[in-house]
């Protein structure tokens, strides 16, 4: 199965190992991976900030860069959710609408692709430790993913997965929300960290590094013992 890799800005600039680990898992699943070096942002930051004209230019490039791809897979429910749910609105009454619809149907978040397309949940991973899982807003509400990451984590040998209270509550990041409303954003992250600590977990795992970056920063500020890991890093462990 041919897969085009989409590496979001956060991953590309700050957490490149997540992308490499995603490739490692996809190749073990039997996929042939290709990567377009010309790819850039999906356009979500500009769109969310209200700059629809600028966003449209970036999104048009995205459509061109990934045109013809059999499957597009990304380690970010946030970016995937944006392409799936908002590209068709952005390109309504546009010559690019058809391509936007096709792209929306071909792009998948990493766990969604593994479980629902490849129908594989066990990659022989092993990771000794206690962890709790954070449902990102984009994964839960835009990509409709709940059970998929947990199915994958349940097959990781040595990993004890413990659910925290209010697991579906936002971590407070929300892109520019964290900048515009910092006190609220930090308070939401503190609540998430408190719930995670109550499970006695050592790690918080999620599909989205943007959430994890925010949680990690707040956890360090609180001198919490909690560490964060992307799902791809866990699935690529131990083999």
Which role does the model predict for each range below?
Residues 1-239:
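Iron-sulfur cluster-binding electron-transfer modules in prokaryotic oxidoreductases
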């Amino acid at each position: 199965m041919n897969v085009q890799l989409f590496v979001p800005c956060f991953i590309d600039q700050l957490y490149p190992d997540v992308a490499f680990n995603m490739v490692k898992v996809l190749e073990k699943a039997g996929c042939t991976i290709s990567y377009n070096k010309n790819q850039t942002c999906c356009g979500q930051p500009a769109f969310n900030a209200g700059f629809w004209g600028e966003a449209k230019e970036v999104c048009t490039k995205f459509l061109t860069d990934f045109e013809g791809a059999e499957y597009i897979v990304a380690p970010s429910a946030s970016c995937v959710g944006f392409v799936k749910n908002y590209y068709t609105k952005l390109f309504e009454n546009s010559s690019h609408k058809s391509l936007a619809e096709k792209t929306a149907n071909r792009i998948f978040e990493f766990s969604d692709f593994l479980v629902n397309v490849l129908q594989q949940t066990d990659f022989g991973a092993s990771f000794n430790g206690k962890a709790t899982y954070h449902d990102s807003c984009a994964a839960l509400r835009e990509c409709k993913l709940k059970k998929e990451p947990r199915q994958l984590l349940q097959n990781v040998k040595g990993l004890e997965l413990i659910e925290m209270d209010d697991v579906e509550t936002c971590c407070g990041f929300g892109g520019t929300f964290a900048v515009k409303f910092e006190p609220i954003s930090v308070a939401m992250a503190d609540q998430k960290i408190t719930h995670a600590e109550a499970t006695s977990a050592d790690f918080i795992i999620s599909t989205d590094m943007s959430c994890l970056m925010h949680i990690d920063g707040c956890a360090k500020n609180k001198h919490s013992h909690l560490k964060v890991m992307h799902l791809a890093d866990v699935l690529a462990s131990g083999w």
